[in-house]
Curated annotation (Swiss-Prot):
Transmembrane segments: none annotated. The keyword Transcription applies. Coiled coil: none annotated. Residues 37-56 bind DNA. GO terms for molecular function: DNA binding. It comes from Escherichia coli. This is TrfB transcriptional repressor protein. Gene3D superfamilies: 1.10.10.2690. Pfam families: KORA (PF16509). The gene is trfB.
Length: 100
């Protein structure tokens, strides 16, 4: 599965990150526009690792963002209650997935 973000998700992810414009341009190109990382390796003369790191920084930041109306919780529960909470989490994730 390719890593992709909408422009709005991308903007939220980079807010507060201390990254340069080149990193932003690379990450937007790959994550929002769907361009291959190899394109940036060639056009900018960077290593594969440098391009991958630029994309990974923004992708990791995006993973920390919660959808509006959601809250991250940590709890210690009896096994049967934990099972129920995990089902709720799976249902919520499914509802957030874009429809194909």
């Amino acid at each position: 599965m390719k890593k992709r973000l909408t422009e709005a998700q991308f903007q939220t992810a980079i807010k507060g990150l201390e990254i340069g414009q080149q990193t932003i341009d690379i990450a937007r190109g790959v994550l929002v526009d769907g361009r291959p990382q190899a394109e940036f390796v060639t056009s900018l003369g960077l290593t594969k690792g440098a391009v991958s790191q630029a994309v990974s920084r923004v992708w990791a930041a995006a993973g920390e963002q919660l959808p509006e109306g959601f809250e991250r919780v940590t709890a210690v529960l009896p096994e049967h209650q934990a099972f129920i909470v995990k089902k709720w989490e799976a249902d919520a994730k499914r509802k957030q997935e874009p429809k194909s």
